[in-house]
């Protein structure tokens, strides 16, 4: 009798269930956290269910092509890894995610708050976009960008939509400032209830890394997470002139992440960006912001012929990806979905999540009678009246 554990899971929802089962409560809560009441994070997911398909009954293509490019990188499906901070839910963290993305032929955004240095991540995946928050002065920001370029990053993602919202109805995740002996003793009762997670970390002979090595110079441990976070809170928010300045400094593809308004999308184009991501920071930003998919169609129509438009927020199925692409996205970025896979099964779990999305994309293309994601059009999607949100659009003359 084969007693080997079946590690494969069928849906992203099952990956989430496994992550909840295997992680200490405080660690798992950091993966589901959202700002305030959680209106936006809920809308991100549930809004996709409001969209329908217009399938064909005969003439489905024998083969379906999902390949595309994002910021100059050829990828095998229109899904890339979104940058998320401190992936210490698994000892291999961002390195495991990068390996999984490479194995499935796609690119990865690496957070400047990552738990692994960029040099280690680029070593296993040469399609890395480095993400930067506006933290510190221009010299410090430029130094991080130059380190990323030297390491081999092929693009820059700038995230500026964070508003430091306070208060979560279900409580904020309890992340210690440092993993010293006192902290480990305090957390031990909780960790003992999750022996598999404890065993994974025990094998490494080191506690979870709560430092952010990409905020310092190469070879340094970097500051503790909360020290860097505090500096970020104390840094004046960037202006459009700052974005244009950084764009001039970076010789390569450049994405502005967090765009939800048409007027901001147009300003981003004027600043010279290569791509934008229609996003509300996964519901971790200003609660009450519309779901990204609601804002996508109007933004894509306004600037989609000038820059690459991506979407992130709420992707749980391949059919969600197809809906986003049909409504104007070049590709989507995923966050919580792959973190749950990482927590559940490490690199294999992330690969599993990408395989789930690939299968769902293929099935939806077949049903719609489309041989390629590039053949998708808005008419393939049933969009109910009142679904879209046109933010930052001047009122019509005479209205």
Swiss-Prot record:
Transmembrane segments: none annotated. SUPFAM superfamilies: FMN-linked oxidoreductases (SSF51395). Belongs to the FMN-dependent alpha-hydroxy acid dehydrogenase family. Its cofactor is FMN. Keywords: Flavoprotein, FMN, Oxidoreductase. Disruption phenotype: Cells lacking this gene lose the ability to utilize ethanol as the sole growth substrate. They are unable to produce PMFT(H2) and glycosylated (methyl)MFT(H2), and accumulate AHDP and glycosylated AHDP. This is Pre-mycofactocin synthase. One of its GO terms (molecular function) is FMN binding. It is an enzyme of class 1 (oxidoreductase). It catalyses: 3-amino-5-[(4-hydroxyphenyl)methyl]-4,4-dimethyl-2-pyrrolidin-2-one + O2 + H2O = pre-mycofactocin + H2O2 + NH4(+). Its EC number is 1.4.3.26.
């Amino acid at each position: 009798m084969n007693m080997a554990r079946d590690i494969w899971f069928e849906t992203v929802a099952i990956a989430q269930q496994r992550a909840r089962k295997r992680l200490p409560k405080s660690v798992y809560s950091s993966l589901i956290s959202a700002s305030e009441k959680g209106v936006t994070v809920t809308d991100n997911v549930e809004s996709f269910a409001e969209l329908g398909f217009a399938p064909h009954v005969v003439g489905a293509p024998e083969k379906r092509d999902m390949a595309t490019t994002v910021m100059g990188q050829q990828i095998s499906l229109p899904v890339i890894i979104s940058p998320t901070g401190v992936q210490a839910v698994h000892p291999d963290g961002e390195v495991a995610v990068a390996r999984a993305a490479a194995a499935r032929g796609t690119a990865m955004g690496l957070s400047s708050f990552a738990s692994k240095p960029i040099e280690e991540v680029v070593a296993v995946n040469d399609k890395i976009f480095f993400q930067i928050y506006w933290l510190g002065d221009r010299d410090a920001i430029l130094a991080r960008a130059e380190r990323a370029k030297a390491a081999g990053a092929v693009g820059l993602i700038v995230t500026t939509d964070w508003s430091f919202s306070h208060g979560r109805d279900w409580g904020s995740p309890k992340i210690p400032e440092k993993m010293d002996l006192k902290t480990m003793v305090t957390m031990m009762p909780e960790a003992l209830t999750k022996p598999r997670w404890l065993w994974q970390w025990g094998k490494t002979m080191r506690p979870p890394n709560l430092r952010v090595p990409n905020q310092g110079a190469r070879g340094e441990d970097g500051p503790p997470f909360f020290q860097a976070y505090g500096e970020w809170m104390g840094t004046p928010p960037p202006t459009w002139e700052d974005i244009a300045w950084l764009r001039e400094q970076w010789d390569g593809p450049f994405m502005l992440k967090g765009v939800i308004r048409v007027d901001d999308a147009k300003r981003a184009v004027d600043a010279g960006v290569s791509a934008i991501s229609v996003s509300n920071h996964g519901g971790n930003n200003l609660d009450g912001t519309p779901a990204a998919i609601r804002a996508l169609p109007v933004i894509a129509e306004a600037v989609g012929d000038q820059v690459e438009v991506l979407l992130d927020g709420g992707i749980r199925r391949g059919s969600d990806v197809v809906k986003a692409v049909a409504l104007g996205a070049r590709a989507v970025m995923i966050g919580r979905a792959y973190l749950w896979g990482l927590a559940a099964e490490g690199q294999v779990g992330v690969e599993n999540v990408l395989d789930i999305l690939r299968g769902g994309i293929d099935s939806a293309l077949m049903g719609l009678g489309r041989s390629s994601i590039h053949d998708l059009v808005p008419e393939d999607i049933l969009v109910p009246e009142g679904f879209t949100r046109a933010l930052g659009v001047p009122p019509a003359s005479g209205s």
